[in-house]
Amino acid sequence: MLVFLHAVLVTALILLLIGRIQLLERLLLSHLLNLTTVSNVLGVPDSSLRVNCLQLLKPDCLDFNILHKVLAETRLLVVVLRVIFLVLLGFSCYTLLGALF
């Protein structure tokens, strides 16, 4: 019975972790969109004050590859955690059915 309780606790923690990682994924997507927007605005030849102010915000290196790599890693981590969750859920159900019968 103690093993069953541990499995239930771990599955609940995995669900919370998946939620946090999905929040991180949304933040990464938002950051990537913001950098793309700033990069597109700065690419427009315009001498207005708006573009001059945005040039101050432009980072030295807009490396989108790093952001795409991190985004792919977070998505892979979510998939791995979902597989672990399903395995633990199956184990919990199997243990519970074994205890009942």
Curated annotation (Swiss-Prot):
Taxonomy, superkingdom: Viruses
A GO-annotated cellular component: host cell membrane
Topology in the lipid bilayer: Single-pass membrane protein
Transmembrane segments: 76-96
The UniProt record lists the keyword Kinase: no
Subcellular location: Host membrane
InterPro entries membership: Corona_7
Secretion signal, residue range per the UniProt entry: 1-23
Keywords: Host membrane, Membrane, Signal, Transmembrane, Transmembrane helix
Similarity comment text for this entry: Belongs to the coronaviruses ns7/ns7a protein family.
Role noted for this protein: May function in the formation of membrane-bound replication complexes or in the assembly of the virus.
Name the UniProt record assigns to this protein: Non-structural 7a protein
Source organism of the structure: Feline enteric coronavirus (strain 79-1683)
